[in-house]
Amino acid sequence: MANLVSVRRRPYRYPHSAIISSIFLIIIFTPDNLNNGATAFCSQLSPPYLDLQPIFSVLSASRQHHIPAFLLALACPIMGLIPMIKDSSTIPISRLPLLPSF
């Protein structure tokens, strides 16, 4: 008869969370010129519903007020979705992203 041994597993650690946090930290501590350049670049993107200006506003404010990076991970998607939700009634159907058809 086989011995039944319970094996305790260590909790799985997510290595990509460290990568995401390091990307946020790099963005926070970059010079203002790079941050302003990224903001200007994102304002020139063709789809108007992808308004990334609030995200870079949050990033520059967080660097000045020392907000932790994990709060940015929560705030940035919300700030990016607010303009898209608010202006969804004015977006023409042809400018909406293509959805997969099943």
Curated annotation (Swiss-Prot):
Family that this chain belongs to: Belongs to the UPF0328 family.
Protein name, entry field: UPF0328 protein ECU10_1820
Organism: Encephalitozoon cuniculi (strain GB-M1) (Microsporidian parasite)
